[in-house]
């Protein structure tokens, strides 16, 4: 629900007390010429928390310490966190470099760098190391005195040289080795021990994380209060202040009571002509879930009706139709219940996580219901006579259509009988519907009529959902756009007329029993009446410029046809699921299970992407076009954040 917001002027003396009290109420956003910027303390605390969270990721849950080892003031704690981060980063980089050095000098073997230095001092002979490219079959030893073969590694031959020898620089390359591999490994062990010690200290500091959260919360509260106080203008040598603010209308009585207690004068003022009035949404339950979806795309304008519930229910229907699989719905439902149980502590501290799991659970339930209505379960081919199919929505509608075909014998019936002569013998709707035959180029017997009817029904349901969805949006916004009523009438008329034009049978004929010819004739005239009403509404609202409303007929048609994506995406997912099951039957059970798991995992991921993207797109693009202004900004009232140590910031 969108709550109105009005602009008020506040004048009084008790400045600090007034703003502190307003913060407790949380019903006023004060207007300020400057944007709220984080103070140095807030930035430092935020950075400290980020660093601590990043560092503690390397700690296992068992290593995290929950008991404090002593008292630390916030400044000391932050400084130690930053120092540890720097030291751990330095040690990690040193270990990486040391590891590369060990790999480089490993072929030289174990030696003492100290003994080599003593040998050089006593004899004046330098000990050097060289390497050359290894040639298969070539002798490893070199016919030079004081040149000793050490090893072959990495496709190179390594040598030690004592004193001065004449070796070709084109073949041999000197390698610097100030320390041997055993000395490097000794240093590596020392650094690793030091790194473990630093990480252990990080695990101990995890016990102070709640203190940092509380300190950050307090600083944010203090910062927002100071910013609000700065927005006020001081008058009469700072004895009186004045401030402008947006007040939530439903909370106006609380604000007036506060002002009376502090002797503050308040007066409603008109917003500036170019001023954007903030939008305040207040939703609970399913409306709160819808509000989360609405905020993904745009903020409603202050003149918009709150679309939260509409968007949620529409998204629920679209997502269920796109997934179109009861098995996948059970997976979503089971996963959401499992995560809700495992993350029950986090749910208490995170509203976003709680809403996400609730939405996931509801969407899973919707997928189960729609998948059951269309007899779709993990892509498994269900028998035409299965009870699971007989009690489904699509089977019921298909029987109704078959009954209509046998009774009225429309053009579609004649075409089917021509293509499949066996249908002439069928007298009952069920026999006609389940008659099996082979398609051209196919040797498998299938209930061809049944499959055709189901495809047509699902496609028409998608279009019908589009007409209903757009009509609801237009009617919801008809006070702001008079032509909307005409377009609703036009869509209803077009829906009745087009089956006649296409010589097809529609749901309205066999399910709603609307006469075929009469319904088409009425629809033809209703469509033109609706077009005229739309143009008339545009002229009444916008004068002669409203005549361009006739061009919107293309937009309306394209928007309705856009809902065919519901059918197309569901069909694609069903085909992939069925293909996975067919492929798994060609292999052994072990391989088949792997194919099923992998194939359905990929299909679920793609289906979720399609359901989310296109389910939201139909709301935000097609539906918003007729029932939403947008371009608003959310109201951010001065409000005290409750500083609880268990609060997830």
Curated annotation (Swiss-Prot):
UniProt-annotated location(s): Cell membrane
Superkingdom of source: Bacteria
GO biological process entries: vacuolar acidification
Family annotation (InterPro entries): V-ATPase_116kDa_su
Keyword Ion transport: yes
Function: Produces ATP from ADP in the presence of a proton gradient across the membrane.
Descriptive protein name: V-type ATP synthase subunit I
Native source organism of the sequence: Chlamydia trachomatis serovar D (strain ATCC VR-885 / DSM 19411 / UW-3/Cx)
